[in-house]
Amino acid sequence: MRSEAVIAGSGAARDRLPATGVIGLCALIVVAEGYDLIMYGAMLPALLDETGWGMTKSTAGTVGSMVYVGMTAGALTGGRLADRFGRRRPLLVAVGWFTGWTAACGLAGSVAQLGAFRLLAGIGMGAAAAVALALAKEYTAPGRTSLTVTVLMAGIPIGGITSALAGLVLLSEHGWRPLCWIGAIGSALVLLIAIVLLPESREFARTRTPSRVRELFAAPRGPMTILFAVAAFAELLTWYGLNTWITTLMRELRYPMTSALQFSLTLNSGAVIGSFALAAAAVRWGARPVASVSACVAAAMIAACATGLSDRLLLLAVIAALGAAAHSTLNLINAAVADAYPADLRGSALGWSNGVGRLGAVAAPTLGGWVLAATGPLQVFQTFILTSVCAARVVGGRTPTGPPRPPAPGPRPPGGR
């Protein structure tokens, strides 16, 4: 009897959670994911010195890419499961999945084990991001999708900043393993809160209309579905390419800044702060036009970095603006996808665009390395300028869209005919 009362009480708590609470809880999930995703960069100096592992810079890059391979698979499958079984259950499973494998990373005994555990954790991360976006969208007031997506996706760099700070405190004295366990404990606490409070999507519960993935590619939505994925691929390649290579590129160009951490913190802080200003612009003018302009601004800031700025403050301002523009473009592409599809296709659409986009994240470290080795730093900057301009052109172009299917009729009001 007591367990039944607890279950009933938690269900009532979920029903009472306001829309802002649902969005905030989804954002908290993304912060936990961001920590677990980006902690690898903070761990890397200690991993390279790990006794008996023999990790090289080349194998470090391969292990670093494994999480994005997993995220590709997770986004593609998680979105589809969310459209079939609802948002709540797949999201809770995804968070539990990446929490467990993040804890396992702290127990890894070799480079191969760490790479395998990161890949498996990535599956949960990719699924969680796609489903959290779909759920939060369905608790968002009309016209506010861009702001909601920005709030959620700010969790990635916030989690990354948290992992960098944890690394500064713990790495020299305690090694890299505690960073994994801190991430797992934090994610587990978020999971417990979500189990108690996270509701099912109202829109999904109301409609529950059958959908098929093929509808994403059927006329007239097919071109839009493909172009959203191309835009996500190009911009994720730009963003993760910059995150991977900007410190090395600046050193190659002899920029007057010695702290790699300062580059990373400036880029990610700009991403968090600036993205809210661009989200407000998107509320007024629409996600796709602002995303296109934002990608063009990112390309211009990359070009500015490559020209040889000597003023320290100006350089920091350019890097912060670059972070804001590049990250905002990603947010607004997600907002445009969320707005463009009905509820029973939304999870699959977000999973598709994020899944294909993650292939850009997988390719970014390798592509940047190839271009740098074959040519030089200026050509790497030029490569990322081209990918950002490609994203601007694709997301800003006119594509046919299909009208959303009308929702399934709800229950008749009392006394209705």
What are the residue ranges of the model-derived segments?
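Extracytoplasmic gate region of multi-pass secondary transporters
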Residues: 41, 220-276
